[in-house]
Structures are given as C-alpha cells and as structure tokens.
C-alpha cells in the first residue's frame, strides 16, 4: 500500500524487452536503501525490485501492466514519480493507494488559476460515469489528488505549486 505522496523522482536509464515483459532500470537516490523483492510505486504503479546496482535498480513490468498503464510509453531519460510502501504506524498524508491501475486518462487541458494549476482529464467514453466523484481521492501518476470536478468521462484536479514543482 502507498499514500500517493511522492517520495522522490527517478530517471529511466534503460528499457529492455524480453518476450512480453519490459525490464525498466531507474536511477534514484533511494536505490541503496532498497531490497530485492521490495515494492515501489512508479507513477503510481506497484512494481517489484528484481535487481539493484548502486544508484540504479531494475523492475520487471508484465504485459498486462503495460496494457493498462503509461509505463510502456516511458523512454530513456524520462522522470518517474517514486514512492516506497507505507510503514505501519506512519502518518497517512495522502490516501490509501494500492498501486493497481484501473484505467488511464488523457490530459486535455491545463490552466493556471489563483496561483495553482487545474488539470482536466478525459477517459474512454465507454467507461462507467461513476469512475470519479467530486471531492473524492484519485491518484494520477502516483500523486494523491482530490477531484475538483467530475463529469461524464472526465474529471479535473487542482495542483498546488509544491506538487507541480516536485513531481513529474
């Protein structure tokens, strides 16, 4: 389980296909603290560490995850939002995030409003209209956010300057 509070940013260093799997190598300051078999959220997607080498580590992404997330669109040099699993007894500053993606959406509009940013997202028109609710929690690229507006096949969230400057 995760909180949706991004711990740090990582940089994609290598992408290697093997059958239907993708081996994703990330460089991050947290790498030396990680252990093989540990789960880390990458843009909100729960992935398991399979190798560690200094400041870099590798995870394996299966085809179903590639089909349902934006992980397959990553390129070398891209920045990813990272979060380690929550610790029992620690404060829950975001909301409970499982790291299992329900669907992807496309950002259709970004505008500034009163010193923050409003992002509008749209998803598949065949989706149920109850995917989001106003003032409900949602995770976008691993970031815990509150839905500002919820409409058929879309929603809006507001991003404060700190989040805008410290996440991808």
Where are these regions (language model features)?
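Conserved loop->alpha-helix
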Residues: 1-168
């Amino acid at each position: 389980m995760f909180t949706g509070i991004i711990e740090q940013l990582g940089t994609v260093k290598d992408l290697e296909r093997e059958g239907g799997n993708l081996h994703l190598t990330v460089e991050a300051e947290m790498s030396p603290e990680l252990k093989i078999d540990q789960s880390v959220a990458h843009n909100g997607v729960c992935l398991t560490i399979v190798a560690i080498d200094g400041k870099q580590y590798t995870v394996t992404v299966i085809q179903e995850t590639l089909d349902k997330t934006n992980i397959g669109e990553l390129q070398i040099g891209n920045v990813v939002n990272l979060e380690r699993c929550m610790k029992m007894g620690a404060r829950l500053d975001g909301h409970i995030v499982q790291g299992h993606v329900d669907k992807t959406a496309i950002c259709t509009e970004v505008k500034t409003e009163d010193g923050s940013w409003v992002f509008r997202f749209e998803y598949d028109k065949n989706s149920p209209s109850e995917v989001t609710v106003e003032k409900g929690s949602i995770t976008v690229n691993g970031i815990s956010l509150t839905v500002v507006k919820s409409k058929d096949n879309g929603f809006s969230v507001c991003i404060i300057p700190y989040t805008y400057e410290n996440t991808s």
